[in-house]
C-alpha cells in the first residue's frame, strides 16, 4: 500500500475522500492486477493473466469516461466494443480497481491511528496465527463457547450504505452501486453460491469480501463500544483495529436500539462479564466465557435480537451453537482446536511419608484436520479419496524443476501453516502424499516407474525441496535452533501468516 500511495498523489483528495478520479487511472488497475498475480500456485486458471493488458484497460476507461456504462456490460456483441471478450472479464477488471480504491481510506486512517498510538510493528497484529497464542492463554480457563456463523445474505444497497460512513465521495458510491446492481441484480442477495460461481477465483471475490467485512465491522464496532462503556480496562487491539471515526455520532441510534429490544437495557450488565472473549475470521466467530450456562444462553438470545433489530436481517438461532469446551472441538482457521485434561502425577516427600498427588491441567490442543486436508488434496488431484498418492497429469508437461518447485511450494506452505499443531503425525502423512505424488508425476513424464526413476536420479532430488521443520526453524531462528535442539517438534506460531492456507480453507462457505 505504501508503494501505491506514492503514485496516487492523494493529497488533494484526502480532505473529502474524493476517490472518483482514481477510477479512471490506468495504474490503479495495474497495481490491483500485480498485487494478486500468481498468489496461489494451486490456481491453474491462467486465462485472466493471459487476457490482461493495459490496452484493454485504456479502452475500458475510455468507455467509462463516455458514461456509456450499459454498453460495457451489454450481452449484445454488436454494441460491445470489445468483441470476443467475456462480460465477466470486464467485471473482474473493474472489481479489482474498486477494491483497491475502497481500501485507501481504511489504510490511511489505520496508519494515522498507528502513528498516534506509537505502534511500530503492526505486522504482528495482522497475523491470524497470533489468535492461537491468545487462545492458548485464555481458553484453557473458560467453560462455554458460542460457535457463531455470521449471516451472509446482505443486499447490495446495505453494503453501499455501510461504505458511506467511510467514503464521502458520492460519485464513487453511485458508480459502485451501478456496478453491483448490474452484476448481481438489484433485487437479489449476495450469497456464497453467487460469489463462488460468479467470482470463481479469490481475485474476483476481493471486492465482495471487502464490502462484507466492512459490514461486519459495523457489528463489531458496536460490541467494542459496549465493552468500553462497561469496563475500566481498555483493549488496545480492539480499539486499534475497530476504531471508527463516525461511530460516536451513532450513540443515539444505539440507545434507541436497546429501548426497542425487550430487556436489553435492563440486562446490560451482561457486557460487564470480565472473561468474555471474542475472535473472528471471515464468517466464523467464537465467543467464550467462564460464566454459567444461563449467562451464555442470554448472550445467544441478545445476539440474535441485536442482528435483527440493528441490521434488519434474519438471524436464525441455529446459527449460534452453545458448547462446553471440555467436550467440544472447534473448527477454526483450518485447525481442530479443543481443551483437554492433561493428567500429571506429583510425588511429595516428607521425612516420614511420601504422597502421590494427581493433578489434571487443562491444555489447549490444536490438531491438523487430516480428513478435510486429504479431501482437499483429492479435489486438487494429488491423491484419491482414500489418501493414496496419484500423479498430477496437468503438470506433466512442465519442466522437472517447475514440477519440483510446485510440489515443494505446497509442502513448505502446509508445514509452515501447521507448525502449531500439537501432533505432527498427520502433517507427516500429508508430506508423504505430496512427496510420492511428485515422484509419480515425474515418473509419468519420463514414462518410467517411480522406483526406477528414484533409483536413476536419487532421492536427493526430492529431499532438496521438501524442507523439514527443523530446517525451517533453523532458517527462522538460527541462534535458537542449536539451543532448543529437538524443540522444533513443539508448537510454533509464525507471525508472518496473514491469510488461511488455500488447502486448509477449501471447505469455507464464503
Curated annotation (Swiss-Prot):
Keyword RNA-binding attached: yes
Q: Which InterPro entries has this protein been placed in?
A: Domain_X (IPR024937), Maturase_MatK (IPR002866), Maturase_MatK_N (IPR024942)
Under Pfam families, the record lists: Intron_maturas2, MatK_N
One GO term under biological process is: RNA splicing
Give its localization.
Answer: Plastid, Chloroplast
Q: Which GO terms describe its molecular function?
A: RNA binding
Signal peptide per UniProt: none
- Where would you say this protein principally sits, based on its record? plastid
Q: Which keywords label this protein?
A: Chloroplast, mRNA processing, Plastid, RNA-binding, tRNA processing
Q: Which GO terms describe its cellular component?
A: chloroplast
User: PANTHER family attached here?
Assistant: MATURASE K (PTHR34811:SF1)
- Return the similarity comment: Belongs to the intron maturase 2 family. MatK subfamily.
HAMAP family attached to this UniProt entry: MatK
Its biological purpose is as follows: Usually encoded in the trnK tRNA gene intron. Probably assists in splicing its own and other chloroplast group II introns.
**Name of this protein:** Maturase K
Q: Which organism is it from?
A: Gratiola officinalis (Hedgehyssop)
Amino acid at each position: 500500500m505504501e508503494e501505491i500511495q506514492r503514485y496516487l498523489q492523494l493529497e488533494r483528495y484526502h480532505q473529502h475522500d474524493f476517490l472518483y478520479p482514481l477510477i479512471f487511472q490506468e495504474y490503479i488497475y495495474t497495481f490491483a492486477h500485480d498485487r494478486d498475480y500468481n498468489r496461489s500456485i494451486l490456481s491453474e486458471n491462467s486465462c485472466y493473466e493471459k487476457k490482461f493488458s493495459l490496452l484493454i484497460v485504456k479502452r475500458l476507461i475510455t468507455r467509462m469516461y463516455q458514461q456509456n456504462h450499459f454498453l460495457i456490460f451489454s450481452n449484445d456483441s454488436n454494441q460491445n466494443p470489445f468483441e470476443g471478450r467475456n462480460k465477466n472479464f470486464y467485471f473482474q477488471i473493474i472489481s479489482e480497481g474498486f477494491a483497491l480504491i475502497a481500501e485507501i481510506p481504511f489504510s490511511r486512517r489505520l496508519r494515522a491511528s498507528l502513528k498516534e498510538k506509537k505502534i511500530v510493528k503492526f505486522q504482528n497484529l495482522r497475523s491470524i496465527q497470533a489468535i492461537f497464542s491468545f487462545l492458548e492463554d485464555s481458553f484453557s480457563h473458560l467453560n462455554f463457547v458460542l460457535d457463531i456463523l455470521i449471516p451472509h445474505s446482505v443486499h447490495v444497497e446495505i453494503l453501499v450504505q455501510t461504505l458511506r460512513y467511510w467514503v464521502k465521495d458520492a460519485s464513487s458510491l453511485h458508480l459502485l452501486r451501478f456496478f453491483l446492481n448490474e452484476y448481481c441484480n438489484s433485487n437479489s442477495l449476495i450469497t456464497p453460491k453467487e460469489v463462488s460461481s460468479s467470482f470463481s477465483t479469490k481475485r474476483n471475490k476481493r471486492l465482495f469480501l471487502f464490502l462484507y467485512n466492512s459490514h461486519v465491522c459495523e457489528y463489531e464496532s458496536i460490541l467494542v463500544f459496549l465493552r468500553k462503556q462497561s469496563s475500566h480496562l481498555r483493549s488496545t487491539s480492539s480499539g486499534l483495529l475497530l476504531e471508527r471515526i463516525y461511530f460516536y455520532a451513532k450513540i443515539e441510534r444505539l440507545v434507541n436500539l436497546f429501548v426497542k429490544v425487550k430487556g436489553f437495557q435492563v440486562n446490560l450488565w451482561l457486557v460487564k462479564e470480565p472473561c468474555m472473549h471474542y475472535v473472528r475470521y471471515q464468517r466464523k466467530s467464537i465467543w467464550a466465557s467462564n460464566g454459567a450456562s444461563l449467562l451464555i444462553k442470554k448472550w445467544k438470545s441478545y445476539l440474535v435480537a441485536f442482528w435483527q433489530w440493528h441490521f434488519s436481517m434474519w438471524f436464525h438461532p441455529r446459527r449460534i451453537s452453545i458448547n462446553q469446551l471440555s467436550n467440544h472441538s472447534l473448527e477454526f482457521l483450518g485447525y481442530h482446536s479443543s481443551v483437554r485434561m492433561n493428567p500429571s502425577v506429583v510425588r511429595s516427600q516428607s521425612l516420614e511419608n511420601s504422597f502421590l498427588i494427581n493433578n489434571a491441567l487443562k491444555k489447549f490442543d490444536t490438531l491438523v484436520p487430516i480428513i478435510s486436508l486429504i479431501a482437499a488434496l483429492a479435489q486438487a488431484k494429488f491423491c484419491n479419496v482414500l489418501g493414496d498418492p496419484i500423479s498430477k497429469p496437468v503438470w506433466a508437461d512442465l519442466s522437472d524443476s517447475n514440477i519440483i518447485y510446485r510440489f515443494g511450494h505446497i509442502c513448505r506452505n502446509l508445514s509452515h501453516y501447521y507448525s502449531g499443531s500439537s501432533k505432527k503425525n498427520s502433517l507427516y502423512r500429508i508430506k508423504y502424499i505430496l512427496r510420492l505424488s511428485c515422484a509419480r508425476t515425474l515418473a509419468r513424464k519420463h514414462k518410467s516407474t517411480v522406483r526406477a526413476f528414484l533409483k536413476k536420479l536419487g532421492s536427493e532430488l526430492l529431499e532438496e525441496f521438501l524442507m523439514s521443520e527443523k530446517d525451517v526453524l533453523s532458517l527462522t531462528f538460527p541462534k535458537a535452533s542449536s539451543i532448543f535442539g529437538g524443540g522444533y517438534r513443539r508448537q510454533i506460531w509464525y507471525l508472518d501468516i496473514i491469510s488461511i492456507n488455500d488447502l486448509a480453507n477449501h471447505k469455507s462457505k464464503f
